[in-house]
Curated annotation (Swiss-Prot):
Name of this chain's protein: ATP synthase subunit b, chloroplastic
Keyword Membrane set for record: yes
Similarity comment: family membership: Belongs to the ATPase B chain family.
Cell compartments where the protein resides: Plastid, Chloroplast thylakoid membrane
Keyword Hydrolase recorded: no
GO cellular component: chloroplast thylakoid membrane; proton-transporting ATP synthase complex
Length: 185
């Protein structure tokens, strides 16, 4: 490579014969000179350009690999999230179903408790009514007994005199004697 570079340098120092040589003025150059310059640039710049392209290629390749790994990780996370979501949805449905069952059970329990309370209130009312009826009946009996006793005492005071009283005493004494002796009247 050094040999080619040296030969090109020597070509630039050759005395011009009038028609051949390197023109270093870019505006006065011709196609051959531009081709030669480009060829030299391509030949010597090929390694640098190749290295740059290889570096860029390896960076792109590693970026693609990283992206693919991240994509795989994201897919894996997405699958996990979907499975978790499905599990949570099943759990929510289960909780919802259990909630409805529990609500129905509590509703039935409340209806049952209300029915029991209503029956207890009805029984208590019936007992109270029965007790009050018995109390009224007892009060009426007491009043009737008291009034009958009052009438009997009044009758006794009015009807009984001493003579009737003595006769009654004698009669009862006679009965007691007869009992003692074994004779009954």
């Amino acid at each position: 490579m050094k040999g080619i570079a040296n030969s090109l340098i020597y070509l630039s120092y050759w005395p011009s014969a009038g028609s051949f040589g390197f023109n270093t003025n870019i505006l006065e150059t011709n196609i051959i000179n531009i081709t030669v310059v480009l060829g030299i640039l391509i030949y010597f710049g090929k390694g640098v350009l190749s290295n740059l392209l290889d570096n860029r290629k390896s960076k792109i390749y590693s970026t693609i690999q990283n992206s693919e790994e991240l994509c795989k990780g994201a897919r894996h996370q997405l699958e996990k999230a979907r499975a978790r979501l499905q599990e949570i949805e099943m759990r929510v449905d289960e909780i919802r179903a259990n909630g409805y069952l529990q609500i129905e059970q509590e509703k039935e329990d409340l209806v049952q408790a209300a029915s029991v309370n209503l029956k207890q209130l009805e029984d208590s009312k019936n007992e109270t009514v029965s007790f009050e009826q018995q109390k009224v009946i007892d009060q009426v009996r007491q009043q009737v007994s008291y009034q009958a006793l009052q009438k009997a005492l009044t009758f006794m005071k009015n009807c009984l005199n001493t003579e009737l009283h003595l006769r009654m005493i004698n009669y009862n004494i006679g009965r007691l004697r007869a009992k003692r002796t074994g004779q009954f009247l």
